[in-house]
């Protein structure tokens, strides 16, 4: 069967089965459960709770395999425990350190000559918050009548799940009409000597007991850049090793601006470089050997910590998907538009699925919509287009829609107009902060009402700025509407309503003042 036929037929079957669920529910108990969810992260929990709210009998399995250095965590998945939440808290901690220095310029009597964070206290505070979220999550599952088992679960067949309730206990089995796989992913390690034994990942850094010190961050995706930036803001010495380009998949101009901002702030980059080995020295520090792939020259340097941020892999190896007949691509699960796998009653949501944005809000909404289709008669599918995202660096980068390169590739350079400009945040003037990289642009169609295809912004609180514009873009925002919108002054978000200079014009996009 061709891929297109598979997608069409499985989507149709998934929607047809969801519409018929209410009629079939009266035939219980053919299976032990109506829904078994594998994975207690954002997608799995959202799906499980929504399904239970629709009257389904739901069982959720969640299990965290410790990292090579022994890090483990509770229910909630990557976002709560080792992703979005601790990352944002560390980001905030680093911004507060910067704010202390700015406070002096604003008239506060603060001794900013010896500002230094207490790493252990910060980690303890972050972990205490995470544990409170773990507890609230468990209580929420109980209140919503979702059964929860903290155990690794695998497929016995397409309707049967096998698990061990506790180490040494006998294997148990449960059956379910539907199964949703939402096990997410974990960071990759490079296949080089010392990588696993001596390095850590984002799974470890937020609970790391000792100060990171001089840190080599290997990888220049958003995880690597965010970690490097909050470490720098907390007073440590990160270096970023880049194999090829920073922020692959993002707009190139914006990505390069972000890297330039980081360089200006004292974060060095090792460009076109790959690690070859990590060795522990007699003093306990780590010797990293590497090679520049452009010059073919070998080099080495010594660090206190090596953090791998070279991408993530789906956790499919322990699921026994072959027993269920579920098809995969690399380490991800292939699904159709209704999140159905190659087995019509088995679905997948979240980071485990192939070719979809790996973002928490995407996982949550797709999980809820799937539950509604299965148990509430809904036919609404998840719309994966034009999803906004933010890179939480000191000047944040947020975007929604197409990059400039994608727009040109899909529409042609002659059919694209790019409105752009630098700007000067008012609050930057008194502490004399650099505004060199505060920049935004709108990628639009050149003709007609000039529908906007993508919005990009580097600056303070980028996520807060772009969120509202994301809704506008989804509803067909045009350049005319944008420029006819009265901005809120003085804010950085209003800069989008003042975008009058196009790249094609060749005019200087640098403003003369904060109000020009």
Swiss-Prot record:
The keyword Signal does not apply. Binds 1 FAD per subunit. GO terms for cellular component: cytoplasm; cytosol; mitochondrion. The active site is at 489 (proton acceptor). InterPro entries: FAD/NAD-bd_sf, FAD/NAD-binding_dom, FAD/NAD-linked_Rdtase_dimer_sf, GSHR/TRXR-like, Pyr_nuc-diS_OxRdtase, Pyr_nucl-diS_OxRdtase_dimer, Pyr_OxRdtase_I_AS, Thioredoxin/glutathione_Rdtase. Coiled coil: none annotated. Disulfide bonds join 79-84. Its cofactor is FAD. One of its GO terms (biological process) is cell redox homeostasis. It is found in: Mitochondrion. Its EC number is 1.8.1.9. It catalyses: [thioredoxin]-dithiol + NADP(+) = [thioredoxin]-disulfide + NADPH + H(+). Homodimer. This is Thioredoxin reductase 2, mitochondrial. It comes from Drosophila melanogaster. The gene is Trxr2.
């Amino acid at each position: 069967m061709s891929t297109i036929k598979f997608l069409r037929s499985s989507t149709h079957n998934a929607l047809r089965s969801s519409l018929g669920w209410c009629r079939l529910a009266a035939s219980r108990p053919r299976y032990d459960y109506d829904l078994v969810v594998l994975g207690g992260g954002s997608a799995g929990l959202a799906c499980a709770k929504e399904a239970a709210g629709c009257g389904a009998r739901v069982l959720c399995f969640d299990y965290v395999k410790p990292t090579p250095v022994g890090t483990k965590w509770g229910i909630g998945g990557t976002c709560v425990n080792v992703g979005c939440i601790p990352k944002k808290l560390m980001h905030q901690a680093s911004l507060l350190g910067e704010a202390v220095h700015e406070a002096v310029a604003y008239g506060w009597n603060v001794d900013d000559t010896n500002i230094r964070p207490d790493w252990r206290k910060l980690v303890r505070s972050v972990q205490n918050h995470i544990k409170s979220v773990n507890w609230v999550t468990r209580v929420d599952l109980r209140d919503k009548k979702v059964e929860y088992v903290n155990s690794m679960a695998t497929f016995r067949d397409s309707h049967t799940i096998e698990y061990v309730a506790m180490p040494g206990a006998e294997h148990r089995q449960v059956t379910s009409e539907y199964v949703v796989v939402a096990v997410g992913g974990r960071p990759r390690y490079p296949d080089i000597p010392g990588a696993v034994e001596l390095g850590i990942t984002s799974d470890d850094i937020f609970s790391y007991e000792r100060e990171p010190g001089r840190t080599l961050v290997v990888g220049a995706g958003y995880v690597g850049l965010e970690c490097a930036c909050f470490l720098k803001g907390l007073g440590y010495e990160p270096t970023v090793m880049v194999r090829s380009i920073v922020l692959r998949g993002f707009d190139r101009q914006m990505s390069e601006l972000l890297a330039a901002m980081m360089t200006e702030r004292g974060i060095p980059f090792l460009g076109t470089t790959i690690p070859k080995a990590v060795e522990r020295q007699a003093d306990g520090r780590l010797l990293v050997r590497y090679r520049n792939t452009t010059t073919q020259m070998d080099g080495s340097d010594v660090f206190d910590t090596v953090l791998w941020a070279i991408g993530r892999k789906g956790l499919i190896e322990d699921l026994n998907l072959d027993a269920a007949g579920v098809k995969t691509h690399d380490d991800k699960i292939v699904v159709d538009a209704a999140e159905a796998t190659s087995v019509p009653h088995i679905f997948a949501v979240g980071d485990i699925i192939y070719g979809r944005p790996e973002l928490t809000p995407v996982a949550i909404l797709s999980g809820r919509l799937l539950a509604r289709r299965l148990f509430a008669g809904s036919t609404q599918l998840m719309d994966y287009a034009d999803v906004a995202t933010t890179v939480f660096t000191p000047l944040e980068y947020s975007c929604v829609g197409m990059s400039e390169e994608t727009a040109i590739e899909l529409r042609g350079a002659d059919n694209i107009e790019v409105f752009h400009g630098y700007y000067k945040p008012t609050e930057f003037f008194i502490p004399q902060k650099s505004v060199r990289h505060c920049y935004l642009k709108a990628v639009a169609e050149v003709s007609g009402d000039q529908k906007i295809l993508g919005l990009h912004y580097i600056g303070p609180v980028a996520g807060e700025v772009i969120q509202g514009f994301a809704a506008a873009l989804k509803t067909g925002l045009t350049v005319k509407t944008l420029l006819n919108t009265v901005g809120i002054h003085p804010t950085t978000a209003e800069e989008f309503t003042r975008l009058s200079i196009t790249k094609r014009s060749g005019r200087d996009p640098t403003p003369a003042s904060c109000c020009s």
